[in-house]
């Protein structure tokens, strides 16, 4: 993204959105009358005396061991008897099984709500770090193998966000309004305590149980928010922190999400569409960016008029492709250029599937699916059921309910949001015409109706901290460059490493050799760049023939998700 503040990028700011010009609409900013304690709490001895029992999780090749720790449900009320369990993973450097590594590095993949046990083997796979770090991953409270929250049964957003009919807007509003009651009723009292203030204290408990004075950190996406707040709550225990693909952690969550419609639209129109047009001879979506976008819009209209509901794998899986599914597929594939080829192939398939259905009816479309090789059917099922990696857009659910519920709890609990339906509808009406991929769905947000806990967290400033290294690609769709530059200017002592000509969300670990070298130097030596730096992007690769299933190479967050899948479920 060109260097522009959020106010310029969207023509609007979080403060200005409280009164949208020309609409007559106003929205109150949500506040609490009684405040939860905002600083860290002294830890009760019973939590510090617990012994961690490590067991191997996953195949031996991952060298990963996992344990459960006990933490209070509410850190400001440690003697209530209401405890929760948290899942932690570790990988010890080769040759250090009997000696304590000199440093410990924690990782978080973001979400917020992403399970993170896979961060330990992922970080251990970075050769530059492998000598003398203990690698730690964890599932934050609410998700993964830790104590879960759930919103199961909540209606969700199945409507077409572009439909501005009053009855459709009623349905969107009612779905958003009903989300919290479902979450609260089924989460057994945990929901208000799934927030960043509680989670950073969980992290520091892990630090103390491991016996380290300071931690290093690699946080992606929502993990930049969590990392900055850990620094704010526990500055004396901060080591070398890398914040990759940045939220604006110096402002409320709303600022970060308000930047997404433009950033996703830019990634789609300025990165994917020109790339697809350049390779039209192989992909067949149109010979110009305008024609590629036209292919998408035409397909969206057809799938709205007549969704394609197909059976895969001999009827064992049924997938419904409608306009929302199409938008979700596109948004999900904007996070990494490694998914561009799969997206192009899927768009061509859906175009042909829809055409077959229009011409010959549902049976003709099903015959087209049945003719696909089993490997291709498996790939379509995998892509249809995957979770978003990185900071997801509003209204787009994770495949996993606990991740989805944790995302909602953290983003709605942490910081105030403007309240009320009128605000959300006016926001969507303003952003939708400019940024149709996501803008119309900006009213699909439970936070506009959320009864927050009385929580007020200190604003991260960076003052008194060691250097923080912030890393950002310029066309990141989920966390816009505008957010990184805004936070960087407000975060004392930070350095910003920008990757130009790049749009991947999540950089460290294979996206850019220049960036990896700078980050590894910082993490292994503590030597930070003396000034802000930039690296040149390595470009979007041409389509390969034939398309091979993506193994996550060059896409760090996909690799982390793969590791997490392999090492989870062993602590039940």
Where are these predicted regions, by residue range?
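A catalytic-pocket lid/entrance helix-loop region that shapes and gates access to the active site
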Residues: 151-161, 229-295, 330-332, 341, ...
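Short beta-strand/loop motif that positions the catalytic acidic residue
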Residues: 464, 469-472
């Amino acid at each position: 993204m060109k260097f522009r503040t959020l106010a310029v990028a969207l023509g609007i700011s979080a403060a200005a959105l409280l009164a949208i010009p020309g609409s007559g609409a106003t929205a109150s900013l949500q506040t609490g009358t009684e405040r939860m304690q905002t600083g860290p709490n002294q830890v009760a001895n019973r939590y510090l005396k617990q012994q961690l029992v490590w067991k191997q999780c996953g195949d031996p090749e991952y060298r990963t061991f996992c344990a459960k720790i006990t933490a209070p449900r509410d850190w400001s009320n440690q003697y209530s008897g209401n405890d929760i369990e948290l899942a932690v993973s570790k990988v010890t450097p080769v040759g250090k099984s009997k000696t304590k590594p000199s440093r410990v590095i924690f990782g978080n993949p973001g979400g917020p709500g992403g399970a993170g046990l896979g961060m330990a083997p992922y970080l251990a796979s970075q050769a530059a770090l492998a000598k003398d770090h203990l690698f730690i991953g964890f599932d934050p409270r609410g998700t993964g193998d830790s104590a879960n929250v759930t919103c199961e049964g909540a209606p969700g957003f199945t409507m077409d966000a572009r439909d501005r009919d009053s009855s459709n807007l009623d349905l969107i509003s009612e779905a958003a309004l009903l989300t919290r009651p479902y979450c609260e009723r089924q989460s057994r009292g945990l929901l208000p305590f799934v927030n960043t203030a509680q989670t950073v204290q969980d992290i520091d408990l892990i630090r103390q149980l491991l016996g380290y004075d300071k931690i290093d950190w690699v946080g992606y996406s929502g993990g930049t928010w969590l990392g900055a707040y850990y620094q704010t709550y526990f500055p004396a225990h901060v080591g070398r922190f890398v914040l990759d693909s940045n939220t604006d952690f110096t402002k409320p969550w709303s600022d970060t999400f308000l930047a997404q419609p433009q950033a996703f639209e830019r990634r789609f129109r300025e990165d994917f569409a020109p790339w697809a047009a350049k390779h039209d001879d192989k992909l067949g979506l149109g010979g110009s960016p305008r024609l590629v976008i036209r292919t998408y819009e035409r397909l969206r209209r057809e799938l709205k008029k007549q969704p394609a509901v197909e059976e895969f794998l001999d009827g064992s899986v049924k997938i419904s492709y409608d306009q929302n599914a199409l938008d979700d597929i596109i948004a999900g594939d904007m996070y990494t250029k490694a998914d561009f080829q799969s997206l192009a192939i899927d768009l061509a398939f859906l175009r042909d599937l829809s055409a077959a259905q229009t011409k010959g009816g549902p049976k003709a479309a099903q015959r087209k699916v049945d003719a696909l090789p089993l490997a291709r059917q498996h790939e379509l099922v995998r892509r249809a059921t995957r979770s978003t990696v990185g900071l997801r857009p509003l209204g787009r659910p994770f495949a996993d309910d606990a991740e989805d519920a944790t995302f909602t709890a953290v983003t709605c609990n942490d910081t105030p949001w403007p309240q009320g339906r009128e605000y959300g509808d006016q926001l969507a009406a303003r952003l939708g015409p400019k940024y149709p991929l996501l803008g119309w769905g900006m009213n699909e947000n439970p936070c506009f109706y959320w009864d927050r806990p009385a929580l007020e967290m200190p604003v991260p400033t960076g003052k008194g901290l060691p250097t923080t290294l912030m890393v950002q690609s310029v066309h990141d769709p989920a966390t816009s460059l505008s957010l990184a530059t805004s936070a960087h200017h407000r975060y004392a002592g930070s350095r910003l490493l920008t990757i130009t000509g790049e749009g991947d969300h999540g950089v460290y670990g294979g996206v850019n050799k220049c960036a990896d070298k700078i980050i590894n130097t910082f993490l292994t030596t503590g030597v930070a760049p003396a000034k802000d730096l930039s690296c040149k992007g390595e470009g979007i690769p041409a389509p390969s023939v034939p398309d091979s299933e993506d193994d996550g190479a060059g896409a760090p967050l996909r690799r982390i998700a793969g590791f997490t899948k392999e090492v989870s479920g062993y602590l039940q």
